[in-house]
């Protein structure tokens, strides 16, 4: 039997890290078993569902590279199918119309609460004969009486619910709209889902859904209910911990590989290995290896992984993601070095692509002023001679290469009998406007000959004015 999994978010908000991890685990279960992955949008909550949220979910999935084989399916486009099944259940007697008023239901719950009883529907309309009336009604599933529902969860082991603890679930509201728990069952059946991976908050839905599947004569899928993600302080994950949109991580400069690697390790492990490519995840992933204990979100670990991937992935690939940040920061990359070369030069220092973009601006744009602190420290009178001599050496070069630039800087220090820092730091501030950059040879090479010479001339003029003031 072909493994078939699904990710079924509700479009009431963005795709957050918890949802992204569930999607990843479900995707990996399909890919690890040569199966199929279905994307389904559960938009039956019409009042809260928005197209913007739906678009954000699709954008997040695409950015992460979690491609789907079927879908996206939308529940609101399947109402005819749900109503068809409800009609069949009413005819077979596995569902019934309930005419109880809201007032009666509220009074029942208040009475049960006062008596310390579980609050559930009492089956008042369960065995009433059919009646011809215009009274409003809901449709309820006729849950089995007695016995229990047992299933083996890949994460949590054997789970059992008594049927007596379950009430007769509403499967269609008074307006005729089918309910979430019912739509999920029909969808999983129709789409041939063999394994359901979802959050632990759905555990209580599972026995109800299994009972409906049994009533329909449908196969029961496997289940894996993953634990919640906590903040590093042990509290439920919130925005202050990192419970933000997946696309916010893109905006903050993270690579999708880093976020995927981080998310897969939030509850799953393979020995002591920390860094996993997608291919390795597909090779090693097993649902039974997911830990049922909650996982703590640690931003420092995510940053470490991001640094790793910026340094080790193909610079051409990293450059495709960096381009978004260059555009976002309004840096025109058409007049300057190839972005992949900038990635190679700056990757060792960069924590995020957002930082990398900001620190690469001087490769593409001239700066109005030198950093005041760095200029005060390094563009002093003693810097005039080194800057003038290195300018002459660079102007005399027949080729503008990293090796030739390096020799020109070294020769300047040798002829002046000073340390490299006496030449290097004034030169660095001259061409970058600041005090940090990669090696000066590669920095000048990437800035380009014309720009470098113009900036050194500007620095010499700055130092001369300072001497004369």
From Swiss-Prot:
Q: Which Pfam families match?
A: Anticodon_2, tRNA-synt_1c
Sites binding ATP sit at 239
Cofactor(s) the protein requires to work:
Zn(2+)
Question: What SUPFAM superfamilies is this protein classified in?
Answer: An anticodon-binding domain of class I aminoacyl-tRNA synthetases, Nucleotidylyl transferase
Q: Which InterPro entries match?
A: aa-tRNA-synth_I_cd-bd, aa-tRNA-synth_I_codon-bd_sub2, aa-tRNA-synth_I_CS, aa_tRNA-synth_I_cd-bd_sf, Glu-tRNA-ligase_bac/mito, Glu/Gln-tRNA-synth, Glu/Gln-tRNA-synth_Ib_cat-dom, GluQ/Sye
Motif 'HIGH' region boundaries: 9-19
Q: Give EC number(s), comma-separated.
A: 6.1.1.17
Q: Which domain of life is it from?
A: Bacteria
What does the record give as the reaction this protein catalyses? tRNA(Glu) + L-glutamate + ATP = L-glutamyl-tRNA(Glu) + AMP + diphosphate
HAMAP family registered for this protein in UniProt: Glu_tRNA_synth_type1 (MF_00022)
What is the protein name given in its UniProt record?
A: Glutamate--tRNA ligase
Q: Which organism is it from?
A: Shewanella sp. (strain W3-18-1)
* Species classification: Bacteria, Pseudomonadati, Pseudomonadota, Gammaproteobacteria, Alteromonadales
């Amino acid at each position: 039997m072909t493994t078939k999994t699904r990710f079924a978010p509700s479009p009431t908000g963005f795709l957050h890290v918890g949802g992204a991890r569930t999607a990843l685990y479900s995707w990996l279960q399909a890919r690890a078993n040569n199966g199929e992955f279905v994307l389904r949008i559960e938009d039956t909550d019409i009042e809260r569902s928005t197209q913007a949220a739906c678009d954000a979910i699709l954008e997040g999935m695409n950015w992460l590279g979690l491609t789907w084989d079927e879908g996206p399916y939308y529940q609101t486009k399947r109402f005819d199918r749900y109503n068809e099944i409800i009609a069949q259940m009413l005819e077979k007697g596995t569902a019934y119309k309930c005419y109880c008023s809201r007032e009666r239901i509220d009074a029942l719950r208040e009475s049960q609460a006062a008596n310390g009883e579980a609050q559930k529907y009492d089956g008042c309309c369960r065995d009433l004969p059919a009646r011809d009336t215009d009274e409003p009604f809901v449709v309820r599933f006729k849950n089995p009486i007695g016995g229990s529902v047992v299933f083996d969860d890949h994460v949590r082991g054997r789970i059992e619910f008594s049927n007596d603890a379950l009430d007769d679930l509403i499967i269609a509201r008074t307006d005729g709209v089918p309910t979430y728990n019912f739509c999920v069952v029909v969808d999983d059946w129709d789409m041939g889902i063999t394994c359901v991976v979802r959050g632990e908050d759905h555990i209580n839905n599972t026995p109800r859904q299994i009972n409906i599947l049994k009533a329909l004569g449908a196969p029961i899928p496997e289940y894996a209910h993953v634990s919640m993600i906590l903040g590093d302080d042990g509290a439920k994950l919130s925005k202050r911990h990192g419970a933000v949109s997946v696309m916010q991580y893109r905006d903050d400069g993270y690579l999708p590989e880093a976020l995927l690697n981080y998310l897969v390790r939030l509850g799953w492990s393979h020995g002591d290995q920390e860094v996993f490519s997608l291919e390795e995840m597909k090779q090693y992933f097993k649902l039974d290896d997911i830990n049922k204990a909650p996982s703590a979100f640690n931003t420092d670990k995510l940053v470490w992984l991001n640094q790793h991937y910026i340094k080790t992935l193909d610079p051409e690939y990293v450059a495709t993601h960096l381009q978004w940040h260059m555009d976002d920061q309004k840096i025109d990359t058409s007049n300057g070095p190839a972005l992949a070369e900038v990635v190679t030069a700056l990757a060792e220092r960069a924590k995020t692509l957002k930082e990398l973009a900001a620190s690469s601006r001087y490769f593409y744009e001239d700066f109005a002023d030198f950093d005041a602190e760095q200029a005060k420290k390094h563009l002093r009178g003693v810097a005039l001679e080194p800057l003038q001599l290195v300018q002459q050496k660079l102007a005399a070069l027949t080729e503008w290469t990293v090796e030739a630039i390096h020799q020109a800087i070294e020769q300047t220090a040798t002829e002046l009998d000073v340390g490299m820092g006496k030449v290097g730091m004034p030169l660095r501030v001259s061409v970058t406007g600041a005090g940090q950059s990669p090696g000066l040879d590669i920095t000048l090479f990437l800035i380009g000959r014309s720009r470098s010479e113009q900036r050194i001339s500007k620095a010499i003029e700055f130092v001369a004015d300072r001497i004369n003031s």
